[in-house]
Amino acid sequence: GKKPILGICLGHQAIAEVFGGKLGLAPKVMHGKQSQIRFETPSILYQGIEDNRPVMRYHSILIEEMPEEFEVTARSTDDQAIMGIQHKILPIYGLQYHPESIGTPDGLSSIQNFIEKVVK
């Protein structure tokens, strides 16, 4: 459907799996670990946020292969893991990191962008 979706962590992974992507185990467990991310593709979620920002990670599974209908919006700089995705047509977004965490200083801005600019 066309209902806006924002998948966070496991939700991000579930979106990829539902659309035919492939998941795998991360090379190392990233529970309570902070990484920098770089934006790869413009996304409404990152409007007003500077590139190369810290994010908090809590996961041991990653998206290894993206579904064709999606584009990668962000990757971690330390291990090049997929940290953000968006559907090319539908209002579906995923974030591997936790935007609600204190370890993601700009995370609430991403959530606010989703609510104000996608959900409306």
Language-model region placement:
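Conserved hydrophobic/aromatic beta-strand scaffold that supports enzyme active sites
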Residues: 34-36, 82-84, 94
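Phosphate-binding/catalytic loops
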Residues: 52, 95-105
